[in-house]
Design a protein with these regions (language model features):
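Short acidic, glycine/serine/threonine-rich helix-capping segments at coil-helix boundaries
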Residues: 329-336, 344-388
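Sec-dependent signal peptide recognition
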Residues: 2-7
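Intrinsically disordered, low-complexity polar regions and short flexible loop motifs
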Residues: 33
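Proline-rich, low-complexity linker regions of envelope-associated factors in Gram-negative bacteria
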Residues: 19, 318-329, 353, 383, ...
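N-terminal signal peptide c-region/cleavage motif recognized by signal peptidases
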Residues: 13-15
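Cleaved targeting-peptide boundary
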Residues: 18-26
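Catalytic glycan-binding domains that act on GlcNAc-containing polysaccharides
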Residues: 38-270, 283-286, 294-333, 355, ...
């Protein structure tokens, strides 16, 4: 944090001072990179004359005003147009996708779903120079260690002859190509799909698709098993059981009355499954499987993993989301901070009021819901905020606000 404040002070002081600070950092970095085997030619091509990109810093620090509901997330990513474009790609690249699926066991609809979500099937690869972006972020200091490592890997990719420094473009964070691989992911999993002796995840679709399939296989993909399916929950369902950490055999969920939303039988899988409620108990419900965890290794967002499942399902001709969306409004970041603060003051540990919906805050919401006989889904719905505000006001009026620990949340039976 101190480094971030210093950076802001430097930028505010003017471009000359900022450039001097950056040049000093860059000189030391070049020496380290050279000591690690990066060639002088690559260092010159990638870093000579480079200046910090203030737009990259702005994007790195950008904070949304509101949380995003699951339905909002899907509305932007799994649309009829996106499905239609994906089905056209399935037809156009059928032979290539068949070959990739045969080698790696990753369904073609899943690969195309990743492709659509990452870059709209190659339409939006990112136009920022990756070495410049990574150098800016490594100098910035907020996550300097991570981005310094990514910059070194980007230089190694250039050094290996896979792409020139000027053609290595991507997102502001350094994600590259059709599947938006970070440099470290490229070096660990990218493969030469077209056999031309170099790996070009930007212009060679075989390289991009083979690389993505290799990643998913190495991440532990389970053949012939879904990522997630929409389900219908029975009347009287114990909402405490709807959490990704609560895994049961599919047969046990069936015995509890859980059914597939499309009336098909629940899939038979070797592992265990969980039920998740991305928009609370009033919204859609999903059963997630081991491949959900694989997708979460690619992107740690549960909404993203569910979007992969839904888009791939629709690409294969399946139905769109069947259930209602739940409470449509999302809390603002400031409202979530207020919710966290109120829970803390009532003795329920929600962590630092930061406006971020992490596991600690979700558990705190569950504790509150259990104490007040509300559906225990851990979701920060506007109705939950209103209930907490009312209870907080009553506790304050009675002089009962406290920071003492609240009763422990009662886990459902059968939790591993």
């Amino acid at each position: 944090m101190r480094r971030t404040f210093l950076l802001l002070a430097v930028l505010a002081a003017g471009p000359v001072q900022a450039q001097d600070d950056f040049d000093s950092w860059l000189g030391a970095f070049r020496q380290d990179a050279r000591a690690q085997g990066i060639s002088p030619a690559t260092l010159d091509a990638a870093l000579s004359g480079v200046v910090p990109n203030e737009r990259v810093i702005e994007l790195d620090r950008r904070q949304p005003e509101f949380l995003q509901t699951f339905s909002n997330y899907l509305e932007r990513r799994v649309t009829p147009a996106q499905v239609a474009r994906g089905q056209a790609q399935l037809e156009q690249h059928a032979a290539l996708l068949d070959a990739v699926e045969q080698k790696y066991g990753i369904p073609k609809t899943v690969l195309v779903a990743f492709w659509g979500l990452e870059t709209r099937y190659g339409a939006v690869l990112g136009s920022l120079n990756v070495p410049t972006s990574l150098a800016t972020l490594a100098w910035d200091g907020r996550r300097s260690g991570f981005f310094r490592s990514q910059l070194l890997d980007a230089l190694r990719i250039i050094d290996a002859g896979h792409v020139s420094a000027t053609d290595m473009n991507g997102s502001w964070a350094g994600a590259m190509g059709n599947m938006q691989f970070m440099p470290s992911t490229f070096r660990a999993y990218a493969v030469d799909g077209d056999g031309d002796g170099r790996i070009d995840v930007w212009q060679s679709l075989p390289d991009a698709l083979y690389s993505a399939a290799n990643y998913l296989q190495q991440a532990g993909w389970h053949a012939n098993e879904p990522v997630a399916i929409e389900v219908r929950l029975p009347e009287g369902f114990d909402w405490r059981q709807a959490r990704v950490a609560h895994r049961l055999p599919v047969a046990d969920w069936k015995a509890l009355g859980v059914q597939a939303a499309d009336a098909d039988a629940l899939p038979e899988v070797a592992g265990r499954a969980a039920v998740v409620l991305p928009q609370g108990w009033q919204g859609p419900a999903f059963m997630v499987f081991d491949n959900f965890d694989v997708v979460m290794k690619w992107n740690r967002s549960q909404n993203y993993a569910l979007a992969v499942a839904l888009l791939s399902h629709q690409l294969a001709g399946g139905h769109a989301l069947a259930a209602r969306e739940g409470e449509a409004e999302a809390l603002s970041v400031e409202q979530l901070k207020a919710l966290q603060q109120a829970l803390n003051e009532m003795g329920i540990d929600a962590g630092t009021p930061d406006g971020l919906l992490g596991p600690r805050t979700q558990t705190a919401i569950r504790v509150y819901q259990a104490l007040h006989q509300l559906p225990v889904d851990g979701y920060p719905a506007p109705s939950v905020l209103a209930h907490v505000e009312q209870a907080h006001a009553a506790a304050a009026a009675a002089g009962k606000l406290t920071l003492a620990p609240a009763p422990t949340f009662a886990e459902p039976s059968g939790l591993p």
